Curated annotation (Swiss-Prot):
This is tRNA dimethylallyltransferase 1. The keyword Nucleotide-binding applies. Its EC number is 2.5.1.75. The record marks T108, R130 as: Interaction with substrate tRNA. GO terms for biological process: tRNA modification. The lineage of its organism: Bacteria, Pseudomonadati, Thermodesulfobacteriota, Desulfuromonadia, Desulfuromonadales. The keyword tRNA processing applies. The gene is miaA1. It is an enzyme of class 2 (transferase). It comes from Syntrophotalea carbinolica (strain DSM 2380 / NBRC 103641 / GraBd1).
Amino acid sequence: MIFDHNDKRPPIVVLCGPTAAGKTALAVRLAGELPVEVVSADSRQVYRHMDIGTAKPTSEELAAVPHHLIDVVDPDENFTAGNFCRLGRQALNDILGRNRLPIVVGGTGLYIQALLHGLIDVPDGDSELRATLLRAEQLHGEGTLYQRLQIVDPVLAKRLPPNDLVRIVRGLEVYELCNRRLSDLQAEHAGQKSPYRVLTLGLTMSREALYERINHRVWRMLEDGLAQEVEFLLKRGYAAECKAMQTIGYRELVQHVLGNLSMDEAVRLIQRDTRRYAKRQLTWFNKVNSIIWLDSFGEFAKVLKLIDSFIYAA
């Protein structure tokens, strides 16, 4: 792997991949060899009190290496990719200021993308305009908004399925609010250079091995007290309907606690939905050409060599 010796941007390492691939364990192991700190890029680990079901680092792992962007907000608070970008970049710059190497560890592709490349500067959503657009779809029939998008932003329309109403509405919303095509804004943003020099490593394994690890981890979470964690959250007043409680592992056990689902069925659904989530993560990351894929186990020496070459490329 050849790195650019003339690139003077500050270096960061990204360690990504599907859930249960062993990212945290590798980051902790790297901390034994390198002066690193971890920035968690996990959309659920930002929530306080949700420890077991989000597979947060253990107390031993947290003691081994400083972690950032964990336990940031309560489960009933809103947290967006924009929030993550702002706080994450602050953490990166703080770590770099201490002459340490930031390692971004996680499987939330959108958060990683926002951190590295920022977010498109578009207006916030307008609930009144959105409601007007949705009423037009109801009044004039299914496909009305998609046809409208084909006229005002044909490039975006070509990318979207005709039934993806959320993104269709967003495209029309942006056009109405700033008189710019969202596809043009996306193209302009894609051409911008990241403020960081990035080495992106992806952990992978065979699908069979990954699914086996996922199934086993679900059982381990239950043994560690995931059902009790869900009961605790409900007793603290976090509603079953709040966004964090509707994520995998929590929504199923909420239904079990409420008597609507047997434990066996809850486990089956958690395992199934986690496998599906891992598949979606891989689909996202497989579109990122810069990722160097590594086997989750047995390539530690290669990881160290890659990071060493990357750091001293500048």
